[in-house]
Structure formats: structure tokens, C-alpha cells
């Protein structure tokens, strides 16, 4: 009645080798993925791709000088529309508007301005070999005038936000906070770790440092825009409570940065900058 079945042959060479350790690791990964899911991106902004070494600024513009001076790579139209003033220092990057807007000459700063609705757009045709040291002062003054006196939100950009726009931002910090090239570089690098101007651009910043020192032989160097801002109301104009435009939701200054700049205000009024602030 009963029939013997042939013995079952198992060829272990055909089975995947799974150790007890690997099984535990797989279980951990599965449970981790269930517990920790990425936060959804707000619907008003496009989803950013995964950050990698080739993509700086994965979360949008970074505020370098609170509350209203930002650094970024080539901006999209929605990002541009979040600002009042855009300074593009990349020769190869064109504006995304469908028309050329309205043009006027800013005789105060010797710059050509394009106006699109409420946005003032300045295109500076720098490439990586441009000798721009002599141009920096008028651009720094323009940034200071718009951000500090007119309380406008300012974006400085180039193609990647790494070299040319970083140089203009470093130059602004040099003159505004009375820092040398090295300290100003570290100041910007701390807030935007992607920056990395080449040595040719760093040498031009060193040249600009000499220009600043030469022009400041009579006292601390600051642009006329900064001096006028201080004379009016240093606290309200340099660090206004209400920006000219709505805050950019992508990146907002942290509470720690706000408190740090409160200390900077106090140290500037006393004529010195502490090591912690730089």
C-alpha cells in the first residue's frame, strides 16, 4: 500500500548564501524604511532631486547675510519671482523672461538695469577669466544700497553658485563686516559649503582687499550706502523686522543666525568684530 518516495536532493550550491547577520541587517533596513519616510516637499515649490556632489544648493537659495541677501546657482523663474533684485554674474546664463523688459541706467552705481514687473535684473558678463577686481566696489555698493537702504531682497547668482557669485558675496562681506579675504571666505563658506573660487579669482579678491584698504586710509572702510544706512537707523535698516518681499520659503534664516547677527550689530557699533562672528 505505501510507496516509498525517492530521497529529496538539495544542491546547496544553487541556493543563495544568506548569513544570520545579513538577515538581521535586512530586517533592520526594512523596519527603518517603514519608520523614517522623507518629509513631503511643500506643494508650492518643485520637488528637488536627491542632493549629490554635483548638485549644489539642493534646497534653493541660501541666505548669506540675513535677512535679505542670498546666494544661488542658475535660478528658475519661480525663484527669481521671489526676489526684488537679481544680480547674475555669469556671462553664459540668460534671464528666463520672455521679453527684455524695461531698461534704465543706474547712474549712481554705473550699471544697466532691466526691469520685469517688480524685479530689477542686473546681468554682469563675467566668465572665469574676467578681471573684475575694479568692478567689485560698485557692485558691492549696489547690493548694500538695495538690501540695506531700500530693504529689498537680493539674489546673487552665477551658473553653479560656486565661483563668480561667491566672489561677489565674499567681496560684499569683506567690505560690510571689515574682514580680510580669508575671514570673509570662511564666513560665506560656513553658510554655503559648496563655494570654491579658483586661485585666479581669490587673487582678484586679494587685489580688491588692497583697493578697500587704499580707499579707507582716512578711516574704517565702508561704502557710502552703508554709511548712509548707519546714519539713518542702523538697527532698523541693516536688520529690518519686515522684509520688502515675502520670505523665501525654501530657506529661511535660523534662530541661531538671527541671534548671531544681533551680536554682530553690537560689535560693529563698538568698532570691532569678534572671532566668533567671523
Curated annotation (Swiss-Prot):
Record-listed E.C. numbers: 3.1.3.48
Catalytic residues of the enzyme: 158
Keywords attached to this entry: Cell cycle, Hydrolase, Protein phosphatase
GO CC terms of this entry: cytoplasm; cytosol; nucleus
Region Disordered, residue ranges: 217-278
Enzyme class: hydrolase
Residue intervals of the Tyrosine-protein phosphatase domain: 60-214
Assigned protein family: Belongs to the protein-tyrosine phosphatase family. Non-receptor class dual specificity subfamily.
Function, as annotated: Dual specificity phosphatase that dephosphorylates MAP kinase pmk1 on a Tyr. Has a role in chloride ion homeostasis by inactivating this pmk1 MAP kinase pathway.
Official protein name in the record: Tyrosine-protein phosphatase pmp1
Originating organism: Schizosaccharomyces pombe (strain 972 / ATCC 24843)
Gene: pmp1
Amino acid at each position: 500500500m505505501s510507496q516509498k518516495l525517492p530521497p529529496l536532493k538539495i544542491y546547496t550550491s544553487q541556493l543563495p548564501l544568506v548569513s544570520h547577520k545579513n538577515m538581521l541587517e535586512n530586517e533592520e533596513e526594512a523596519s527603518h524604511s517603514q519608520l523614517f519616510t522623507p518629509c513631503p516637499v511643500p506643494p508650492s515649490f518643485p520637488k528637488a532631486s536627491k542632493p549629490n556632489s554635483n548638485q549644489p544648493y539642493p534646497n534653493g537659495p541660501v541666505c548669506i547675510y540675513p535677512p535679505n541677501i542670498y546666494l544661488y546657482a542658475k535660478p528658475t523663474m519661480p525663484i527669481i519671482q521671489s526676489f526684488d533684485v537679481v544680480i547674475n554674474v555669469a556671462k553664459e546664463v540668460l534671464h528666463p523672461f520672455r521679453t527684455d523688459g524695461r531698461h534704465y541706467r543706474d547712474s549712481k552705481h554705473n550699471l544697466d538695469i532691466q526691469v520685469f514687473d517688480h524685479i530689477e535684473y542686473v546681468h554682469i558678463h563675467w566668465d572665469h577669466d574676467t578681471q573684475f577686481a575694479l568692478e567689485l566696489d560698485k557692485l558691492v555698493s549696489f547690493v548694500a544700497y538695495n538690501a540695506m537702504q531700500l530693504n529689498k531682497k537680493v539674489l546673487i547668482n552665477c551658473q553653479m553658485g560656486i565661483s563668480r557669485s561667491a566672489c561677489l558675496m565674499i567681496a560684499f562681506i569683506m567690505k560690510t563686516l571689515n574682514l580680510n579675504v580669508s575671514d570673509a571666505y570662511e564666513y560665506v563658506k560656513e553658510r554655503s559649503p559648496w563655494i570654491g573660487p579658483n586661485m585666479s579669482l581669490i587673487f582678484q579678491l586679494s587685489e580688491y582687499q588692497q583697493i578697500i584698504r587704499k580707499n579707507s586710509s582716512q578711516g574704517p572702510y565702508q561704502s557710502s550706502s552703508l554709511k548712509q544706512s548707519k546714519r539713518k537707523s542702523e538697527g532698523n535698516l541693516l536688520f529690518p523686522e519686515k522684509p520688502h518681499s515675502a520670505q523665501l520659503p525654501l530657506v529661511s534664516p535660523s534662530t541661531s543666525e538671527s541671534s548671531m547677527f544681533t551680536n554682530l550689530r553690537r560689535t560693529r557699533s563698538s568698532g570691532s568684530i569678534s572671532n566668533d562672528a567671523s
